[in-house]
Amino acid sequence: MKKYLPLLAAALALTACSTAPESTTAPMQTPAAENATGEESAAAFPIGELRAYNDWMPCTDTAYYTLYNQEGTTNLVGLKLDYANGVQTKVMSLDLANDDSYSDWFVTNDNVVRVFLANEDGSEFRFKSFYPDGRSEERTASQEITPVIYDEYAAYVLRDKYVGRLDWQTGEVTTWSASIPQINEILGVAHNKVVLTRIVSDMPLPTDHEMYEAVLQNSLMEYDLYDVSSNTLKKLFDEPYYPEGGGSRKSYMGYRGDMLYFDQSRPDGDDITKVLWGYDCSAGTLQELYAEKSTGCMGGYSTPQGFTRSGQLEFLFLQSTLDTLHIYKTANGQVYKVPYHDPTLDAAYGNAENYGRPIALTGDGRVLVTDGYVQRDGYPTDAYSLIDLDAYLSGSTDYTPVQMWQDE
């Protein structure tokens, strides 16, 4: 059975802040772990529009991409929905008969899409690129890496003491030394800066499980910006490793201007309150922007999600009732109740209404939403439509259907 490559997950894009309390240049150290082809400087390479891998953004301002396994075959099919003409087309088909695993899409801002592949015995790690003009090419990587960010030129892996770079054109992996002690998670990227968290403790984290947990009790979770081009790390803010009051850790949702947005679930008696936080990079302050109890909120579509246009966060889905989405618009700080219907709430998938769930935001200000079904390989799958953002937030369901691809 084919499986996804164990690539590290990340969340959505976010911005470079204009000011931050700390800035340190990473000292030159000997990189550990993976054996790379050579030691380089970050300044030796071009930097494009950085994105986080698996940030739920298989899209650009002009197109939305999906992957699916073709029923009864070993084929992996890639589809592209062009926002301009509202037509979904097939852009790739890969026969995975001789491959053991593969990654999700790596979609760059220039609408080039890539997939990582590995054979069954793990002896070969490669990637295939698909270009807007219909060309495709496959390259073997000089070594296996687990990319967490990428741009038009390369994919990157970040470690405590080094950064590895896989060149899309050559397949070569090079490294430079870095100092990102006890890196915990990659949260997102924007303007060529990577937002991440680090564990800050009084002592190095031990390998013994009980001692490890004991150290974490008195540790901090620090939110930082790492600049790939200058190899510098800046602190944003920190909080206890285990949030006070039993709340969840803050999940990054996206940015608009100097404001970074985070979602958090906070216990409130027998209930839970959903809290939206904003970190103002220019002021260096963290503030509560909106809070709402989750009483009566449920639904198959329940994971908070941010939607961006040209990298800027336009709106956030917070939570839902049975037939309404609660959506926060960053431009004015208002919450809108938007009608939708999620088929996962019904006993039989495909036999009920399916509309209004946001999928992506186009560069010209329209929302891609679910709207009914199409049959694919004998099974129902979501159909899509487009609607103006302001009309969508006002409750309109006057959708314009797109032309979904059908297998011949």
Model-assigned labels for residue ranges:
Residues 21-69, 76-82, 86, 90:
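N-terminal, intrinsically disordered, polar/charged segments of Gram-positive cell-envelope systems
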